[in-house]
Amino acid sequence: MAKKLQVVLNKDVNKLGKSGDVVDVAPGYARNYLIPNKIAFRTTPGVLKQVERRQEQERQRQIELKQGALAQKTALETVGRFKIAKQVGENDAIFGTVTDRELVEVIKESTGQEIDRRGVTLPEISKIGFYKAEIKLHPEVIAEVEIQVVGH
């Protein structure tokens, strides 16, 4: 069996790993491609300690982000219901639709919290009434808020 060489990746490499990962690769692949193209560099005990420290800092940062998202989720869910006023036609049908931008603006006005609109998932809203929307605050944290669409 061929000996493997341990390298640290500088860039994300398909099917190999992400930047900062320590991976075992064939010596020829490392010497002829990864290292000359500055995609990776060889590991030493000092480099391994640095990588471990960096990974621990990243883990701590992810934990803090998740805790912040959980706090934001509880704040959003304690508000209860967000009201959005739309122009209404016949049979309580609204003109246009409720957009993620409108919901984000209403949330910001009522709670003062900034939310990324790309994480908002709205159902098809065509009439006045009550609807549930999902807001992805973190890959592992999803808040569910209630929207009340009213006519004005």
From Swiss-Prot:
InterPro entries: Ribosomal_bL9 (IPR000244), Ribosomal_bL9/RNase_H1_N (IPR009027), Ribosomal_bL9_bac/chp (IPR020594), Ribosomal_bL9_C (IPR020069), Ribosomal_bL9_C_sf (IPR036791), Ribosomal_bL9_N (IPR020070), Ribosomal_bL9_N_sf (IPR036935). GO terms for cellular component: ribonucleoprotein complex; ribosome. The keyword rRNA-binding applies. GO terms for molecular function: rRNA binding; structural constituent of ribosome. Coiled coil: none annotated. GO terms for biological process: translation. The keyword Ribonucleoprotein applies. PROSITE patterns: RIBOSOMAL_L9. Keywords: Ribonucleoprotein, Ribosomal protein, RNA-binding, rRNA-binding. Binds to the 23S rRNA. Belongs to the bacterial ribosomal protein bL9 family. This is Large ribosomal subunit protein bL9. The gene is rplI.
